Design a protein with these regions (language model features):
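Surface-exposed, low-complexity loop segments enriched in small/polar and acidic residues
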Residues: 1-88, 146-199, 220-283, 318, ...
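Hydrophobic, lipid-facing positions within transmembrane beta-strands of outer-membrane proteins
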Residues: 28-34, 89-95, 121-127, 193, ...
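Transmembrane beta-strands of outer-membrane beta-barrel pores
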Residues: 40, 56-62, 109-115, 141-147, ...
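Short loop/turn motifs that connect adjacent beta-strands in outer-membrane beta-barrel proteins
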Residues: 41-48, 99-103, 134, 215-216, ...
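Transmembrane beta-strands of outer-membrane beta-barrel proteins
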Residues: 48-54, 105-107, 123, 137-139, ...
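Surface-exposed extracellular loop regions of Gram-negative outer-membrane beta-barrel proteins
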Residues: 50-54, 82-132, 202, 356-358
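C-terminal beta-barrel architecture of Gram-negative outer-membrane proteins
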Residues: 160, 298-398, 413-414
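C-terminal beta-signal and adjacent terminal beta-strands/loops
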Residues: 218, 310-311, 358-371, 397-451
Length: 451
C-alpha cells in the first residue's frame, strides 16, 4: 500500500518485499535434589525438628533469530540472539526449636555455588512469641541473593540509535559545543549481555504482631525493611559518554581514524551492557483485618489487606559517573504509597459469591529525562497520576465432586485507568502499564476440576 498516493503496489512489488522467517529458541533445565527431615531431641515446648537438602541444577538458553535478521536484511523488528549456560550446587539446613510452649525459634542457612559468578551463603533467623492465647509477636532477619539471569549474561548484541552532540569531537575540532556548528546526530548504541555479572545481594528484616480475640476477628500488623545492593541495571548513556568518549582508544566508545592533526576520530558506536551498580532500600507497613461469621444460613468472610510504603530510596550513578546519588522514589512514578485489597465472600451450601475491591494510590507522573538519561526528580515536579479502583464480582457453584463452576465480571464498573504521560518509551498509551490494567469490563466463565 502506498500511503502517499491513490494506487496500490502491484503484487510483484509486494512479493519482492515479503519473506518468511524462522526463529529457533530452546531452554533446558535439569535438576536433581535430595531432602531429609525429622526430629532431633525434645525441648520444653516440644520436639526440635531439622530439615536439610542438596540440589544440583543445569540450565541453558539459546535463541537464534532468522539468518535474514542476522545479515541485516530485515528492518524495524527486534531480533536479538542469546546463548548462555551454567550449573550450580546448593545445600540448605533448617532447625525448628520450640524453646518454650510460647516461644519458637527457626534457624536456617543456604549455600549456593554457581559456575559463572561464584558462591554465596545466606542465613535466616525468625522467632514467634505467644504470651497469651490469640496474641503473638513475630520477627525475622535474613539475607538473600538473585543470580543474574542467563539472558543478562548471554544476550547477543542489538543496536539502537541515540540523538546527541558529540561535544568531545566538537572541542577537538575547535568548535564551541554550545554553538549551532556543533550539530547533534544519530549515533549507534550497541547493547549486549555481560558474562562478568555478580549476584544481587539483599538483607531483610520484619517485625509484627497478630491478634485473634475470638473465632470471628483476626488482626495483624507488620513492619518490613528490605535493602539491596549490587543491583543489576543497564549503564546509563550519559555515564558511558562522559567516562569513555573523551579518548581515541576505548573498548566502550568506538571512534574512526582521526584526520591528520586531529586527536579524535568521528564517533562510530558506543558499547553498553548490564553492570552491578547502585543500591536500593524500601520499608513499609502491612495491615490486615479479617472477619468471619455465620450470616443468613451461610458463611460470611470480609478481609482487608492494606500496604503502606513508607520509603523507597535508590542510589545510582550520577551523570558523570563520579559518585552515587540517593533519590527518594516514594510516591514517584510507579511507586504509589498506598494499596489495598478488600474482599467479601459469602457461601451457602454449594453456592457462593465474592466481591473484590482493588485500590492503587496516586503517584507522580514521570519527570523529564535529561540528556544523561537520569530522571530529574528533584527539579521537575510533574503532574499527578490519580488513584485507580476496580471492582471484581464472581459467583460459583461447587455441587459436583472436584468441579467448580464460576461466572465473573472483572472491572465490573468499567473503570478506565488514570491518564499518564509516562516515560515516552514503554508507556505510550496514556496509562502506566506496569501498575494499571487497561482492560475494561471483562465477563468470563471458568471451570476448575481437581483430582
Amino acid at each position: 500500500y502506498n500511503p502517499f498516493g491513490a494506487t496500490y503496489n502491484p503484487q510483484s512489488v509486494i512479493d519482492a518485499i515479503t519473506t518468511s522467517l524462522v526463529r529457533q529458541g530452546t531452554a533446558t533445565l535439569t535438576a536433581y535434589d535430595a531432602q531429609i527431615s525429622g526430629g532431633l531431641f525434645d525441648l520444653a515446648g516440644g520436639a526440635a525438628m531439622m530439615a536439610a537438602g542438596v540440589e544440583y541444577r543445569e540450565e541453558s538458553i539459546k535463541d537464534i533469530p532468522d539468518d535474514q535478521f542476522q545479515r541485516g536484511l530485515i528492518f524495524g523488528t527486534e531480533a536479538v540472539s542469546a546463548q548462555a549456560s551454567r550449573d550450580n550446587w546448593s545445600a540448605f539446613v533448617e532447625f525448628s526449636l520450640p524453646v518454650l510452649d510460647s516461644l519458637e525459634l527457626n534457624l536456617a542457612a543456604r549455600y549456593d555455588d554457581y559456575s559463572d559468578f561464584g558462591n554465596t551463603t545466606n542465613p535466616k533467623i525468625s522467632a514467634r512469641w505467644e504470651p497469651l492465647d490469640g496474641l503473638a509477636f513475630r520477627a525475622s532477619w535474613g539475607t538473600g541473593f538473585r543470580a543474574p539471569s542467563l539472558a543478562q549474561v548471554g544476550l547477543g548484541p542489538s543496536q539502537e540509535s541515540q540523538f546527541f552532540k558529540d561535544t568531545y569531537y566538537c572541542i577537538d575540532q575547535g568548535l564551541d559545543p554550545n554553538s549551532l556548528n556543533c550539530t547533534p546526530l544519530d549515533y549507534t548504541i550497541v547493547f549486549a549481555g555481560n558474562p562478568n555479572l555478580k549476584a544481587e545481594e539483599s538483607e531483610n528484616f520484619n517485625v509484627g504482631a497478630a491478634w485473634k480475640p475470638n473465632d470471628m476477628w483476626q488482626f495483624s500488623v507488620d513492619y518490613w525493611d528490605i535493602k539491596q545492593d549490587k543491583k543489576i541495571d543497564e549503564v546509563n548513556f550519559g555515564f558511558l559518554y562522559n567516562q569513555f568518549c573523551n579518548v581515541q582508544t576505548s573498548d566502550v566508545c568506538v571512534r574512526g581514524t582521526p584526520l591528520p592533526g586531529d586527536t579524535l576520530g568521528e564517533l562510530q558506536s558506543i558499547n553498553s551492557s548490564f553492570i552491578n551498580i547502585g543500591e536500593q532500600s524500601t520499608n513499609g507497613v502491612d495491615v490486615s483485618a479479617y472477619f468471619r461469621s455465620a450470616v443468613m444460613g451461610g458463611e460470611l468472610f470480609v478481609g482487608l489487606d492494606y500496604s503502606r510504603m513508607l520509603e523507597f530510596k535508590k542510589r545510582e550513578l550520577n551523570a558523570a559517573g563520579t559518585s552515587l546519588v540517593s533519590r527518594d522514589l516514594t510516591g514517584e512514578y510507579e511507586y504509589p504509597e498506598d494499596r489495598f485489597v478488600l474482599t467479601g465472600d459469602w457461601g451457602f451450601a454449594d453456592w457462593g459469591v465474592r466481591a473484590t475491591v482493588n485500590y492503587t494510590g496516586s503517584f507522580e507522573d514521570t519527570p523529564d529525562i535529561d540528556f544523561d538519561g537520569v530522571l530529574d526528580y528533584d527539579t521537575n515536579k510533574s503532574r499527578t497520576v490519580g488513584s485507580f479502583t476496580t471492582l471484581n464480582l464472581q459467583a460459583r457453584y461447587t455441587g459436583f465432586e472436584g468441579l467448580t463452576l464460576a461466572l465473573g465480571i472483572d472491572n465490573a464498573l468499567d473503570e478506565e485507568p488514570p491518564f499518564a504521560i509516562g516515560d515516552g518509551d514503554t508507556d505510550l498509551y496514556g496509562y502506566v502499564s506496569g501498575m494499571h490494567d487497561p482492560r475494561g469490563q471483562f465477563i468470563y466463565g471458568k471451570a476448575t476440576y481437581r483430582f
